[in-house]
């Protein structure tokens, strides 16, 4: 199935020259991504219902054929717009965007019958009885478990299904889900409809509150058509997603237990619940699972990414015997206990969207929305006289938005409301209604005189000056083929005919022109340069701070031993240290890349990326980079790709569990593709699905972490810019081959493991030599990141508990003593010789 987002519907009014088919215009609300063929099917279905009610008012219709009616097969009809036949595969948004940008405007389409067969291979036949009576709905409900989000597909729900029925269905599904293991909610079977606090349909901008007043009964009577805003499903296999916010609580039996105690979590990360009721037999794994369920920054957090620290001691999941550690083994106090929680830094980025707002603000649905009908007291005061320029300057600063939150950008073009045939209202540009009786004559060098027709509203004569409107200036620029500079303190002609100063003017009407000119000059010479240079100033300050912060130790060494060296060597060493710091500080590079917009993906680059992915040109080396890049894994693990991932797992025989996060299966998919067990097409298919989803939702509230998305797009764009190695010159071909082999065999990692000092095993002289070599090696790019990874890996290895002495003895005995005496290959029996003790 394909997921569709709830968008502003396209509105159509359908008429036909055949009065027997459509007696009164049909009004239809359709999804913008639906096709003309789908709309034609729905219109045909509506006509079929009306004719069946007329010709068979009391009979039970058993088939789709109605005898003696003017309705024929759907393939004999077509829709036309402004006399042009519309293709059945044309999207409805392409009709509205080209001619009627206003979504509230109805588009007139005509239904006509073909005089001859079209010969099209596109068959529009459909099931008249059940095609347009239902929709597919998917539920997403938050849970108190490691899975965080529960998905449930509800196929073929009647379009008359009310919100009250949807709430009951969601309640039934969450009750069934919480019967499974791993759920920490203590309510379970006692959940009621009142626990549903609100919901939102994916694609809409604002959520809908539930159970907050008497008006909730009205909302609960709304059906799917009212909620989504369209009359029919945009495709046969389409579905919409309802995201419900549900209230969950911890187990009340534990809270009332006398032996229980409370863990209070202290962490820099945001947790939706900061306390946990535990019993003496609660394990450390269960505590980590609880933290995974209440962590607000990521949906893919695992136990291995969490560290619990109590009074400086790390709480391990397993004890030395290999059994699960209980929380009571570390904590003996019977009262509230503070436990520090440390989260892996890879999961500190907060993702956008509805669930992020819910997890970061658990009280988002706790309050009734403000009543817009209530009014606050208004104090009336006499207004001071202000110039029209000041008023218009304030109007330009007021942002206007639609009900859905989209910005409204006013233009300079004026329209006049007109009436056609006494009832139809249209808006026509003023320039089309005014006769072109005036011309602007311009002498352009050797080309002679150029005449530009303008209307009377586009110019005013003020003494020796001609004031032009913005539209007239654009005509003049187009005719002369150059740009006219507009000074901020100039006077322009507003389209309404008023003279308006282009400069910001906040002075009153009785200020003189000298004060206005002085203020404009001050803004132009002082305020504007300071305002424009402020971002650059912040970048420079941040850069100097990072250089100084990362160069404290080298500058301290120079300060202490500088008296032994000449000044020229001190300056040279200082410059060398500064160069080294800038080279190895990734934050400085990222800071200037963002300021200079070097990492931005424009439409041209995005088109190249899309074409590169669709051509299956991604290489195994690229997929290897993606496997080692956590941001790429997080993007492929978004909930919207859940069905596509499961489809790939099923296609290539990868075992998976639909009730648990499939991060392990995704990593296994990468491993099998890189090892050659599975063809590369598996990952190609998954990446195509991801970018199809991203292209659909990129202009809306994004579902993806922006930094991670930009990183992945840059990786793909750089991959697409790589030239074929066979087309390069010989010296570059040799260099590329050498770099590829070094990267493939991880030569840098191997060298660094020998260079980085090991305090446990290295002697003093060896450590000094390694530190000296490491100092110069860190001048190379990307070495610092590799260095941090290796040091962190060594620290994790040291934290692993060593086997006890008894276990080591048992392993040694198992290696020495055979289990049973079996004959050898020569037929002789083996004997164990144990020397006598002295």
From Swiss-Prot:
Q: What is the lineage of its organism?
A: Eukaryota, Fungi, Dikarya, Ascomycota, Saccharomycotina
**Where's the Ubiquitin-like domain?**
259-318
CDD domains from the UniProt entry: Usa1_DBD
Residue ranges of coiled coil: none
TM ranges are 537-559, 564-583
Q: Where is the composition biased (Acidic residues)?
A: 809-823
Q: Where is this region: Required for ERAD-L function and HRD1 oligomer formation?
A: 437-490
Can you say where in the cell this protein is located? Endoplasmic reticulum membrane
Q: Tell me the keywords, alphabetical order.
A: Endoplasmic reticulum, Membrane, Phosphoprotein, Transmembrane, Transmembrane helix
Say which species the protein is native to: Saccharomyces cerevisiae (strain ATCC 204508 / S288c)
Assembly, in brief, is: Component of the HRD1 ubiquitin ligase complex which contains the E3 ligase HRD1, its cofactors HRD3, USA1 and DER1, substrate recruiting factor YOS9 and CDC48-binding protein UBX2. Within the complex, interacts directly with HRD1 (via N-terminus) and DER1 (via C-terminus) and indirectly with HRD3. In ERAD-L, HRD3 and YOS9 jointly bind misfolded glycoproteins in the endoplasmic reticulum (ER) lumen.
| A GO MF term | identical protein binding
Membrane topology recorded in Swiss-Prot or TrEMBL = Multi-pass membrane protein
Q: Required for ERAD-L function: where is this region?
A: 31-240
Q: Which residues lie on this side of the membrane: Extracellular?
A: 560-563
Phosphoserine, modified sites: 374, 376, 379
Region (Disordered) residue ranges read: 795-838
The name on file for this protein is U1 SNP1-associating protein 1
User: Its Gene Ontology biological processes?
Assistant: ERAD pathway; mRNA splicing, via spliceosome; positive regulation of protein autoubiquitination
- Record's domain comment? The ubiquitin-like domain is required for HRD1 trans-ubiquitination and degradation. Reported to be involved in ERAD-M but not ERAD-L function. However, a contradictory report states that it is not required for either ERAD-L or ERAD-M function. Reported to be required for HRD1 oligomer formation. However, a contradictory report does not observe any defects in oligomerization following deletion of the domain.
Q: Which gene encodes it?
A: USA1
């Amino acid at each position: 199935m394909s997921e569709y987002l709830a968008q502003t519907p396209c509105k159509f009014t359908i008429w036909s020259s055949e009065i027997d088919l459509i007696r009164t215009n049909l009004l239809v609300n359709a999804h913008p991504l639906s096709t003309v063929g789908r709309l034609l099917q729905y219109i045909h279905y509506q006509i079929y219902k009306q004719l069946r009610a007329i010709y068979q008012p009391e009979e039970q219709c058993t088939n789709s054929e109605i005898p003696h009616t003017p309705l024929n097969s759907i393939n004999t009809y077509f829709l036309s717009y402004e006399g042009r036949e519309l293709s059945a595969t044309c999207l409805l948004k392409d009709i509205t965007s080209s001619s009627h940008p206003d979504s509230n405007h109805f588009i007139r389409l005509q239904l006509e019958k073909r005089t001859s067969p079209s010969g099209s291979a596109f068959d529009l036949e459909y099931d008249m009885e059940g095609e347009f009576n239902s929709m597919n709905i998917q539920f997403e409900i938050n849970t108190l478990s490691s899975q965080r989000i529960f998905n449930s597909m509800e196929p073929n729900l009647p379009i008359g299904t009310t919100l009250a029925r949807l709430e009951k269905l969601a309640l039934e599904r969450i009750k069934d889900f919480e019967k499974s293991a791993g759920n920490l909610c203590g309510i379970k079977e006692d959940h009621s409809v009142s626990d549903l606090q609100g919901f939102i349909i994916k694609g809409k901008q604002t959520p809908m509150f539930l159970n907050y007043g008497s008006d909730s009964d009205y909302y609960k009577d709304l059906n799917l058509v009212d909620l989504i805003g369209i009359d029919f499903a945009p495709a046969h296999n389409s579905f919409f997603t309802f995201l419900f916010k549900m209230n969950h609580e911890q187990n009340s039996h534990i809270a009332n237990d006398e032996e229980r105690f409370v863990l209070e979590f202290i962490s820099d990360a945001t947790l939706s619940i900061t306390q946990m009721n535990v019993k003496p037999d609660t394990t450390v794994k269960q505590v980590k699972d609880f933290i995974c369920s209440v962590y607000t920054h990521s949906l893919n957090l695992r136990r291995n990414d969490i560290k619990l620290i109590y009074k400086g001691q790390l709480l391990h999941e397993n004890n030395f015997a290999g059994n699960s550690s209980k929380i009571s083994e570390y904590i003996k106090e019977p009262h509230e206990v503070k436990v520090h929680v440390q989260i892996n830094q890879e999961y500190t980025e907060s993702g956008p969207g509805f669930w992020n707002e819910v997890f970061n603000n658990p009280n988002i649905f706790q309050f009734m929305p403000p009543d817009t009908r209530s009014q606050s007291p208004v104090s009336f005061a006499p207004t001071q006289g202000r110039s029209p320029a000041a008023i218009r300057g304030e109007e330009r600063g007021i942002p206007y938005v639609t009900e859905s939150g989209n910005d409204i950008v006013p233009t300079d073009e004026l329209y006049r409301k007109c009436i056609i045939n006494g009832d139809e209202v249209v808006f026509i540009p003023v320039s089309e209604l005014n006769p072109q009786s005036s011309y602007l004559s311009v002498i352009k060098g050797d080309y002679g005189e150029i005449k530009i027709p303008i209307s009377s509203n586009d110019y005013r004569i003020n003494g020796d000056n001609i004031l032009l409107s913005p539209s007239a200036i654009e005509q003049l620029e187009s005719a002369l083929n150059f740009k006219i500079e507009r000074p901020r303190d100039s006077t322009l002609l507003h389209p309404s005919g008023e003279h308006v100063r282009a400069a910001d003017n906040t002075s009153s009407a009785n200020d003189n022109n000298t004060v206005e000119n002085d203020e404009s000059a001050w803004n132009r010479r002082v305020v504007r340069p300071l305002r424009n240079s402020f971002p650059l100033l912040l970048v420079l300050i941040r850069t100097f701070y990072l250089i100084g912060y990362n160069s404290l130790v080298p500058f301290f060494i120079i300060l202490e031993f500088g008296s032994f060296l000449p000044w020229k060597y001190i300056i040279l060493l200082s410059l060398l240290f500064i160069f080294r710091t800038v080279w190895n500080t990734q934050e400085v590079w990222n800071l200037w890349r963002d300021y200079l917009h070097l990492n931005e993906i424009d439409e041209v680059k995005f088109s190249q990326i899309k074409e590169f992915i669709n051509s299956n040109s991604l290489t195994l080396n690229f997929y290897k980079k993606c496997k080692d890049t956590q941001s790429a894994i997080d993007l492929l693990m978004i909930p919207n790709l859940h069905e596509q991932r499961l489809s790939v797992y099923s296609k290539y025989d990868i075992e998976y569990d639909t009730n648990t996060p499939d991060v392990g299966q995704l990593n296994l998919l990468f491993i099998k593709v890189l090892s050659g067990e599975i063809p590369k097409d598996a990952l190609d298919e998954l990446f195509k699905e991801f970018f199809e989803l991203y292209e659909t939702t990129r202009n809306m509230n994004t579902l993806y972490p922006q930094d991670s998305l930009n990183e992945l797009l840059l990786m793909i764009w750089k991959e697409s810019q790589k030239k074929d190695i066979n087309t390069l010159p010989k010296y570059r071909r040799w260099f590329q081959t050498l770099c590829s082999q070094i990267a493939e065999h991880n030569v840098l990692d191997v060298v660094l493991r020998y260079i980085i000092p090991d305090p446990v095993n290295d002697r003093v002289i060896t450590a000094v030599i390694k530190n000296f070599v490491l100092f110069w090696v860190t001048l190379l790019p990307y070495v610092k990141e590799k260095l941090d990874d290796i040091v962190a890996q060594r620290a994790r290895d040291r934290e692993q508990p060593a086997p006890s002495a008894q276990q080591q003895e048992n392993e040694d005995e198992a290696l020495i003593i055979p289990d049973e005496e079996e004959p050898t290959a020569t037929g002789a029996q083996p004997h164990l010789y144990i020397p006598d003790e002295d």
